[in-house]
Amino acid sequence: MMPIPATSTDSAAIPQTLLDAYALLAWRAMLTEVNLSPKPGLVDRINCGAHKDMALEDFHRSALAIQGWLPRFIEYGASCAQLPSDDVLKGLRPLGMACEADMFRATAGVNTHKGSIFSLGLLCAAIGRLHQQHSPITPANICSTAATFCRGLTERELRQNNQQLTAGQRLYQQLGLTGARGEAEAGYPLVIRHALPHYRALLAQGRDPELALLDTLLLLISMNGDTNVASRGGAEGLCWIQQQATTLLRQGGIRSPADLEHLHRFDQQCIARNLSPGGSADLLIVTWFLAQISQVNHLHNY
């Protein structure tokens, strides 16, 4: 592993128990999402969705490779807690790239969790910064802190006109989609304002946790301008998948095991159209991770 970049604050104050607890939650979030079944167009325990190049075992290997980096993201966020938030990303990016390299080694070149490395790296660094600043580690604070790390990111990386546009730049210029960068820079509003309250409300009503998570995935698909979907199916594919998810929610969503048949059918339709809502899956990982934060906070005396 590469050394953590030199920074301005001693991060040794973070107890190892806290580092391990937050990192374990982030790792479990990745596993919880991929094992959740059935999911429309996504890899799960039943099939590989619209993907021909990856399987469930790839995601398990990938999550294991990423796990070792999660405490380092937290430590980095703590170690630069006195730096301006705008300066954090430039030091965090090399750690993320090294983590990506480990992911690709573990999966023989398959991109399983690149989006999650970006989001979980930001959120873990935000947790480290908040801890070092003695600020409450809440979902809202974590996401707003991550947003400050990403200030100006969309402008810098999506609006520039390169001779050879990246996929993200092309989708931004053609469809106005900002993808993972835009969601992070805005402080994860789809999660904080919609998915997380929805998931918590379903759990409070006594909904089975897996069914609640599947219902929350539908909510995210219905609202998210998912660049993974748009890159495969264009504006038409994105509109279709959003409408399908919205229709299922209006019909009552995923309330009981009998409703899983609707998801099986949705999955087959996505496979036929070669659509995979990977961006929404990444946001579901964020949602589950943030929903569990209170489990750790008692160790932090919150």
UniProtKB/Swiss-Prot annotation:
Source species, domain of life: Bacteria
Record's keyword terms, sorted: ATP-binding, Nucleotide-binding, Transferase
GO molecular function: ATP binding; triphosphoribosyl-dephospho-CoA synthase activity
Catalytic reaction list: 3'-dephospho-CoA + ATP = 2'-(5''-triphospho-alpha-D-ribosyl)-3'-dephospho-CoA + adenine
E.C. number(s) listed in UniProt: 2.4.2.52
Keyword Transferase among record annotations: yes
Transferase is among the record's keywords: yes
A Pfam family hit: CitG
InterPro entries: CitG, TriPribosyl-deP-CoA_syn_CitG
A biological process from GO: prosthetic group biosynthetic process
Transmembrane segments: none
Family stated for the protein in its record: Belongs to the CitG/MdcB family.
NCBIfam families in UniProt: citrate_citG (TIGR03125), PRK10096.1 (NF007503)
Name the record gives this protein: Probable 2-(5''-triphosphoribosyl)-3'-dephosphocoenzyme-A synthase
Organism expressing this protein natively: Citrobacter koseri (strain ATCC BAA-895 / CDC 4225-83 / SGSC4696)
Lineage of the species this protein comes from: Bacteria, Pseudomonadati, Pseudomonadota, Gammaproteobacteria, Enterobacterales
Underlying gene: citG
